[in-house]
C-alpha cells in the first residue's frame, strides 16, 4: 500500500530554498541529530521541508504550537502531497475539564469532556497510516507527547480478514465487540456494525467515508467489499482487510485480568499506608472508588477514567514514560518542529502542571499512586525519544541554536522577491493620531492594518476610538475561540473590515498577504511582549506584502528594538542584493482566502453526518454575474438551505463561507433588479 512521496507544486525551489534544501538533506544523511532552519516570514519554509521529505522519502511528524497553525500546515502539506497520507493529530477535546480536588474548599471536580468525533477519526487514521505505510506526514500539536495506547497491544487487537478464510459469524461479532465496536442495526455510524443474515457491515473507526461489507457463506468469508455508508454504493472488492480498534486505549482481555490483579495489590499497599497515617476517610474513599472501577473493568473491559490505570494496562514499570505518538513513528522517521521557539518550551511545560494536579488527587485518596504515571512525556524523555530533528523558526530560541551547535541554515531570500518591511520609529506622544492617519492611507488603497498593544484595556479603548472615527475595526483577544479567531482573520483578508487590533495574538505563522502595515504601540516598553523575538515575529506579519511597513512607536530605542531592527535590516539588505543580482522584481502573494480554513469540520469534504451529503461549497464566481434575477434568487434560496444544513451539523466554517457568498449574491441581485 505504501507509495513514494510525490511532491505536487507549480513552483520550483528558488531564492535561498535550493541551498537550504541541499544543506538540510546533507545534514540528515550525515546523521546530524539536530538542525535549525532560520526562515523569514514568507520565504516558503513549508515548501522547503516538503522538498526534503520528498527527496529523502522518510515518514515525518511535523509539530506545531497550536491547532490554528496545525490546520494551516495540514492544508499546505495536503496540497503538496495529494497522493500520499497526510494526517492530522491534535487533541480531540472540544472542551476538557480534568479531574481535580481543591482541599481548601473540599471540592472534588469530576472529569468532564466533549470529544470532537471528526478529530478522533483523524487521530485513528494517523496511527493507522504510520503502522501501514511509509509515505506519511503527520501534522500534530503538542498532544503528541500525551499518553496513547501501546502500539504493541494495539497491533495485537487488530482483526485481519481475508477472502476464503474460515471463521464463524459469532467469532467475528465477538472480536468486533472486543475492539469496542457496538452493534447498531438502525443508525449505521463510525465505530458501529450491523448484521443482516450472513452479511456484516462494519464502519471502521478511522474512516469517514468508506465502510466494509463482510459476506459469509457456510462459515467462510466469501467476499469483502468497500462501500459508501451513506448511499450504499459499492466502491469495489478487496482480497483482505484489517479492522483496527475503535480506540487507541483498547486492551486484550488477558491483559485486563492481569492488570486488575496488579491494581488490587497496589490498593492493598496504599490502604496500609493511609491507615498507618490515620487517614480513614481517604482510605475508605480510595477503596470504594477503586473497587467500583475494578468491577466495571471486569464486566465491560473498561471503566470511566481507565487512563489512570494505564501503567498496568501497558505493562510499564513505575516512572517509565507513557507510550505516545512517537512510539508509532518508524525508527528512521523525521521530526520537524515548526515555530520551534514556541513549541519547544510548550513540550517542557506540560509535565509539571499535570503532576501537581494528580499529586493532590493521590494524597486525598481519589486515585492510586500509579495514576501519576498517566502523564505527558517529560522533556528529557522527549529528547531521548525524538528522531532526527529540524527546528523551523524565523526567530530560533537558545535551545535550538545550542542543539544545532550554533549552525543555522539561513533562508532569508523569498522566491517572490519580497523584502522585509521598512521599519520606522516614531514618538509615543502622538501615536494614536499618527496611527489613524496611516490607517486612512492604507484603507484608501484597499490594504489592511494590524495593530498590537500592550494591554487588553488599551486594545479596547483604541478599537472604540478608531470606530468613532469611521474606521472598520475588530479586536482580537484571548476569549475568542480558535474557530472564531480563524473567521476573524478570514474576514480581514476578505475586506469585511480593515484594521485588526490585538495584544499577543498576531504573531507566529499567520498568513495574511493583504496586510501592508503593522503598528506596534509602546514598542519601547521592554518585556516579553516587546522582546527581540516578539518584535521580529510581529514585524514579519507585514512581510508578505509588496508595500510592507512596520511602525514602532517608542521614545527611545531599547536593546530589543535595536536587535530586531538590525536583524530586519540585515535580511532586507541580503534580499535586495539577491534581487539586483538576479533581476527579480518583488511580487505580491495571491493566496486564496480559503487556505487558512482548509481544515474545517470536514477537511475539504463537507459532509453532513447522518443527514445526507451537503453539497460542496461552490464559489460565487463569474458565473453568478451573468445570472438573471430569477436564477440569482433561486441560487440564494439554495445556498441558504446549505448554510442552515452546515450550521445544524456544527460545521460553522462552511456555513461562514456560504454566508459570505450569499452577501455577494444579494448585492448582485439588488443590482440586477
UniProtKB/Swiss-Prot annotation:
An individual GO BP term = nucleotide-excision repair
Ranges for domain Helicase C-terminal: 431-597
The cysteines joined by S-S bonds are none
Sequence ranges assigned to domain UVR in this UniProt record: 633-668
Q: Name one GO cellular component term.
A: excinuclease repair complex
Q: Where is this motif: Beta-hairpin?
A: 92-115
Localization annotation: Cytoplasm
Domain (Helicase ATP-binding) ranges: 26-183
Q: Which UniProt keywords apply?
A: ATP-binding, Cytoplasm, DNA damage, DNA excision, DNA repair, Excision nuclease, Helicase, Hydrolase, Nucleotide-binding, SOS response
Q: Which GO terms describe its molecular function?
A: ATP binding; ATP hydrolysis activity; DNA binding; excinuclease ABC activity; helicase activity
Which residues does the annotation say bind ATP? 39-46
In the record, the note on similarity to other proteins reads: Belongs to the UvrB family.
Query: Record's domain comment?
Result: The beta-hairpin motif is involved in DNA binding.
**What's the subunit arrangement here?**
Forms a heterotetramer with UvrA during the search for lesions. Interacts with UvrC in an incision complex.
> Record's HAMAP family?
UvrB
Q: What does this protein do?
A: The UvrABC repair system catalyzes the recognition and processing of DNA lesions. A damage recognition complex composed of 2 UvrA and 2 UvrB subunits scans DNA for abnormalities. Upon binding of the UvrA(2)B(2) complex to a putative damaged site, the DNA wraps around one UvrB monomer. DNA wrap is dependent on ATP binding by UvrB and probably causes local melting of the DNA helix, facilitating insertion of UvrB beta-hairpin between the DNA strands. Then UvrB probes one DNA strand for the presence of a lesion.
Q: What is this protein called?
A: UvrABC system protein B
* Organism in which the protein naturally occurs: Klebsiella pneumoniae subsp. pneumoniae (strain ATCC 700721 / MGH 78578)
